[in-house]
């Protein structure tokens, strides 16, 4: 297994086990963290390292915005509001984010919404 493969396996195990410390340590070793994995990490950060949530949410938003060629300003505002609500443990925001992602064809990401 390549070092990239080993790092990704360690990252995925950390996500699965809920270990934010290991996931955050493994992420920089990867060439790229996909949007779905980054969203899983965001929810893990919210639970285990809430002081890091705002910055992580901004980074996830930027990653999403760079990927979605059809993102409009009003959609960006809505997504930011949802991420803010999720950071405050608003379950309605969690449900809305899952629906929001599915409506845009981001099913893998929607499946990661905790």
Q: What are the roles of these predicted feature ranges?
A:
Residues 1-114:
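Long, low-complexity, acidic Ser/Pro- and Gly-enriched intrinsically disordered regions
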């Amino acid at each position: 297994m390549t070092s990239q493969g080993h790092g990704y396996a360690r990252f995925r195990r950390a996500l699965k086990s809920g270990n934010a410390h290991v996931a955050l340590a493994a992420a920089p070793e990867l060439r790229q963290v996909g949007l779905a994995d980054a969203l899983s990490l965001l929810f893990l950060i919210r639970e285990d390292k809430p002081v890091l949530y705002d910055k992580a949410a901004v980074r996830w938003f930027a990653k999403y915005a760079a990927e979605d060629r059809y993102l409009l300003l009003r959609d960006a505002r809505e997504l930011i509001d949802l991420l803010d609500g999720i950071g405050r443990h608003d379950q309605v925001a969690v449900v809305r984010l899952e629906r929001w992602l599915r409506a845009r064809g981001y099913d893998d990401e929607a499946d990661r919404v905790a």
